[in-house]
Amino acid sequence: MLSLESIKKAPRADGFASILAIGRANPDNIIEQSAYPDFYFRVTNSEHLVDLKKKFQRICEKTAIRKRHFVWNEEFLTANPCFSTFMDKSLNVRQEVAISEIPKLGAKAATKAIEDWGQPKSRITHLIFCTTSGMDLPGADYQLTQILGLNPNVERVMLYQQGCFAGGTTLRLAKCLAESRKGARVLVVCAETTTVLFRAPSEEHQDDLVTQALFADGASAVIVGADPDEAADERASFVIVSTSQVLLPDSAGAIGGHVSEGGLLATLHRDVPQIVSKNVGKCLEEAFTPFGISDWNSIFWVPHPGGRAILDQVEERVGLKPEKLSVSRHVLAEYGNMSSVCVHFALDEMRKRSANEGKATTGEGLEWGVLFGFGPGLTVETVVLRSVPL
């Protein structure tokens, strides 16, 4: 019989948790940002709002987004006219789509991550699923185990309604799980859809135009584990050295999301870029002082691309060279703001770009890097990463 002491002393991992694989997925429906204002006002029967459309066109032009992917399409919107009225009772329809599509979109990303990992899925010991899109019992984590055929004893964590900072949250939790048990392999999946927040424009609620111009659909999957099994050709892409979360001072209400019968209504205060950029220096100092690093151009950057203004003001405030945020800007341009998904896309883009350009490491040839998640609260997740040689 095992003693309590022997159970307590179950072997932990020897090393740091590492990102062992990354997968990503997007829906097939693509809309160019330049064409989106015409599409948006046409499908919502709002073309009579001429001045509002001109304002929306200006907003879209400033986003630095080239295209976005969506689960929904024009046929769906036509069949559900409740989406063509601002805050019409539509929660049931939104829920049905999210509950159906989020697990499937997440499974596509997870399948790619497992292929990238190159190990049998039976080695997955934990699952973290994160979405701000719809809620159900059992949740999207359960649905994913059924789609992928994961072991029934996989230990699951379901995160709902976290928002844009959660790409960092999932890595923080995965690090704790991976390092707490020798041999643990954590599958992290984030999946988001704008089905929960798409709605017609309103002259009385013009703040929502920014939401309609920014957000998009996608899914990411990351496999995290410590002590890569070199004999099985398991290889790390990034080492997760440390993680932290903080609520920024004087930021209550700056970013939020409120669910009602009309769906999820996001609030994005115009001061968000200023609040984030004002505080990012302190986050950097607290994270990197233990490692003797204070030159922010000497590390690689993976901030959440919540919007062009956030990236611009962080770059200016910290004194970054323009190329330091190129990966996050690329993700924003090609996919829009996919909430929790974005930073995982950026990590994948960085390692692939580094390899293609012949860099010495997965982090643009640099050793140390930072990943930031920004979201409701205003909450900041800070993840210190270490690249690996290529």
Curated annotation (Swiss-Prot):
It comes from the Eukaryota. Its EC number is 2.3.1.-. The active site is at C164. GO terms for molecular function: acyltransferase activity, transferring groups other than amino-acyl groups. It holds the Pfam family Chal_sti_synt_N. It is an enzyme of class 2 (transferase). Signal peptide: none annotated. One of its GO terms (biological process) is flavonoid biosynthetic process. Keywords: Acyltransferase, Flavonoid biosynthesis, Transferase. InterPro entries: Chalcone/stilbene_synt_C, Chalcone/stilbene_synt_N, Chalcone/stilbene_synthase_AS, Polyketide_synthase_type-III, Thiolase-like. It catalyses: 3-(3-hydroxyphenyl)-propanoyl-CoA + 3 malonyl-CoA + 3 H(+) = 3,3',5-trihydroxybibenzyl + 4 CO2 + 4 CoA. Belongs to the thiolase-like superfamily. Chalcone/stilbene synthases family. This is Bibenzyl synthase. The gene is BIBSY212.
